[in-house]
Curated annotation (Swiss-Prot):
Annotated localization: Cytoplasm, Nucleoid
Family annotation (NCBIfam families): division/cell wall cluster transcriptional repressor MraZ (TIGR00242)
Main location, first listed in the record: cytoplasm
Gene Ontology terms describing biological process: negative regulation of DNA-templated transcription initiation
Keywords: Cytoplasm, DNA-binding, Repeat, Transcription, Transcription regulation
Quaternary state and interactors: Forms oligomers.
GO molecular function, one term: transcription cis-regulatory region binding
High-level lineage: Bacteria, Bacillati, Mycoplasmatota, Mycoplasmoidales, Mycoplasmoidaceae
SUPFAM superfamilies: AbrB/MazE/MraZ-like
Annotated protein name in UniProt: Transcriptional regulator MraZ
Length: 145
């Protein structure tokens, strides 16, 4: 399970040093999968979590245009990225651009993945969500989640 929030940055070559607490949860893997997230962020998954994610996508109805488009958009923008000897990953430029990352980032643990957010984008998201936390919890708990 991935949890926590880490304030970090990327260098001028689009490399992100994986924080030691995050690295400790990655079980000494040598690569991760990076893909475009749903909220102007980048998702970082281990292979097992990525395989589960793909299984979920594969269960979408192939006859649905929306399902096919979602599959294309998600998987065509997914990269298997090596963790180098200095515990860094190279984030592809198109993901950097789509996530609006300049330099400062947050790495957010969200149970089955880490999300990489541009600091400004996440700060805006957080401000807009704090007032609705109790509303979201109430709605989801009523529905048994």
């Amino acid at each position: 399970m991935f949890i926590g929030t880490y304030n970090h940055s990327i260098d001028s070559k689009n490399r992100m040093l994986i924080p030691s607490k995050v690295k400790a949860t990655l079980n000494e893997v040598t690569f991760v999968y990076l893909s475009l997230g749903f909220d102007e962020n980048i998702d970082m998954r281990l292979e097992s979590e990525f395989n589960q994610f793909v299984d979920n996508i594969n269960n979408l109805p192939i006859g649905s245009r929306e399902a096919r488009n979602l599959t294309r958009l998600l998987l065509s923008q997914t990269y298997k990225v090596e963790i180098d000897s200095a515990s860094r990953i190279l984030i592809p430029q198109n993901l950097i651009d789509k996530a609006k990352i300049k330099k400062d980032i947050y790495i957010i643990g969200t149970n089955d993945r880490y999300e990489i957010w541009a600091k400004e984008v996440y700060d805006d998201f957080s401000l807009n969500q704090e007032d609705t936390l109790s509303d979201l919890a109430e709605k989801l708990l009523i529905n048994g989640i």
